[in-house]
Amino acid sequence: MQLYDMHSHILPGIDDGAPSVEKSLVILNELKKQGVTNVCLTPHFYTNEISAEDFAAKRQHAIDRLMPQIPDGMKVVVGAEVYVTRYMFNGDDFSCACYGNSNYILTEFAYTSQFSSHTMEYFVKLTENYNMIPVLTHVERYPALINDPSIIGELKDMGVIIQTNTNSYTKKASFFSKLKLIKLIKGGYIDVIGSDAHSLTHNDPRTFTEALDFISAKCGQSTVRKMMGNAEEIFNSAL
């Protein structure tokens, strides 16, 4: 089974993740040691602060610095973690934020969001007006969703993919938080997983297999295989 990391901040010097190529390679090599050979590079794209054109240029500079040094045996896909705001929908082309050549787009919202009808309208616009498939990042950070899985169900009915972070399943993570997440996984609410790695101290990438082992122990190895299969579909569509 190939392992896929669907969310990371490894591109150098573009956001609050790796500040240099050297630090980027440290994270990539730690993932590789665990057998993670397919990695999505998804720097923050704050749509209320920077245009899509300027973001793409800034990201390209980081890509040009890192790509020649990607470790042997690793594949990477470039995308973005897009903070969704009304400024996205001003007529600009933001397809550059999708995973590679795919129409999947990693999306983030304010953690205090109640996922009201106004927020849901953003998902409608992305899916119907832009023909994109939103991937909602780190579902565990939205209390409104964790406390009311029916809203997650509404999102999934719209075709939204739900992502969770590996560090939410480690020994250091809250027992009750893990309990809620495992219930969501068993209920079919969570589709893919990512490290969200910024460094070895901020969302440590070395927790990847620990998380998969925990999920496997609680939900079965077939669940992990399904999550990786979902990730593989997105990753391959981006190549």
Regions found by a protein language model. Give the residues of each.
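An N-terminally biased module of ancient metal coordination in phosphate/nucleic-acid-related enzymes
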Residues: 1-73, 202
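Active-site neighborhood of phospho(di)ester-bond hydrolases with catalytic His/Asp-centered motifs
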Residues: 3-6, 39-42, 77-81, 135-137, ...
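Non-catalytic positions within long, well-ordered alpha-helices that form the structural scaffold/packing
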Residues: 29-32, 127-128, 185-186
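Active-site environment of divalent metal-dependent phosphoester hydrolases
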Residues: 46-49, 83-85, 140-145, 169-172, ...
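Extended substrate/RNA-proximal surfaces in nucleic-acid metabolism proteins
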Residues: 50-163
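Short acidic/histidine-rich active-site segments
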Residues: 189-205
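Mid-to-C-terminal alpha-helical segments outside catalytic/metal-binding sites
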Residues: 208-239
